[in-house]
Amino acid sequence: MGYRRFGLTTGHRKAMLRNLVTSLFRDERIETTGPRAKDVRSIAEKLVTVAKKGDLAARRQCLEYIYEEDVVRKLFDTIAPQYAERQGGYTRIIKVGYRRGDAAEMVLLELV
């Protein structure tokens, strides 16, 4: 098994991850389950690395994945320059406990 399936169809899983990544860049922190946060972290770090290039091709590549254009603008104008000197490790995961309904491990995923 090369990746997490989350019990979802391919389209649903991709849409969920795109929504979580968009929310992470828009709000700079999200609360979600542990496995979802690990997948979102991987995608988000790659997008920040692409955004650090700052050219038109990089912007178009990010627009393919992130739903909202204003979030891409924020990624390129404020988030990417913030990490210009950092070589990876743009996010952190903080455990916040367990969800009451199903005891799923909840974490806070935030930009450093």
UniProtKB/Swiss-Prot annotation:
The keyword Ribosomal protein applies. GO terms for cellular component: cytosolic large ribosomal subunit. Pfam families: Ribosomal_L17. Keywords: Ribonucleoprotein, Ribosomal protein. GO terms for biological process: translation. The keyword Nucleotide-binding does not apply. It comes from the Bacteria. NCBIfam families: L17 (TIGR00059). Belongs to the bacterial ribosomal protein bL17 family. Part of the 50S ribosomal subunit. Contacts protein L32. This is Large ribosomal subunit protein bL17. It comes from Desulforamulus reducens (strain ATCC BAA-1160 / DSM 100696 / MI-1).
